[in-house]
């Protein structure tokens, strides 16, 4: 269902709110989903093992060459399989798109041969290689991030006293890391910091990192995947921390979906991934803007 009681609980993820009015005339706050993730994990908890969704999703405050407020997401899950399985799925689908289009993936002046074996690069290694930052030195042994330790390594990159560790991490990622990814071949950026785990489980034996990855071509993020977290209490703590930050930053917070959290406790080990379908089409056709591959782009203000 596209209407949800909670659209997702990430600090910088913005949803479209709607009012659902019942037969009694009483309104109820609902949201257009930003991803089918919550609904699909409820299905995993109910016993489904291999599922996918190919649907429109909505995200507010997103507009640009690579962003549309409404876009198409392909999301799928494999119960009982490691997250490397959905990595392989994703690469195979991107390769199929390139083969069908009959040309390398391209965006602006960048090219990517999807038929070549992908590069699998750890986030820690990427920060060292492309930004000269020792990311592991910015974590406590339990994975707690130290904003001052990261601030001391970012050099001339813009920073403010209000920035969190996650703010600085994202700024380095976008400005110094992402432009170097997916050049010539697909890059799988793997093993994200636990502080950026979202809904991913921690890496076994290394609590500072998580089973989260993103797939890039031509410097563009195409997909985001997890080895899925099934610890209800841990997920609740993460959601509350994210909503506290959202409240501090934007003055709003979204409710928690208690049915979803209860489903996590029953969900089997699984891996899952969400792919931005329109971005794949963009790169396969060489389109410069996402609006060029949407059947009916969201209209601009007159």
Residue ranges and their predicted role:
Residues 43-44, 64-65, 200-202, 226-228:
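Short conserved micro-motifs at the rims of enzyme active sites and ligand-binding pockets
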Residues 42-49, 58, 79-124:
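Internal, well-ordered alpha/beta segment that forms a basic, Gly-enriched binding/recognition surface
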Residues 23, 37-39, 57-59, 78-81, ...:
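Short, glycine-/Ser/Thr-/acidic-enriched flexible segments
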Residues 232-302:
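Active-site pocket scaffolds in enzymes
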Residues 32, 47, 76, 126, ...:
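A residue-level signal for conserved active-site and pocket-lining positions in enzyme catalytic cores
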Residues 15, 96-222, 226, 241-267:
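Metal-assisted phosphate- and nucleotidyl-transfer catalytic regions
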Residues 1-85, 95, 178, 282:
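Class II aminoacyl-tRNA synthetase-like tRNA-binding/catalytic domains
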Residues 32, 36, 86-90, 165, ...:
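Hydrophobic (often cysteine-bearing) scaffold residues that line and stabilize catalytic clefts
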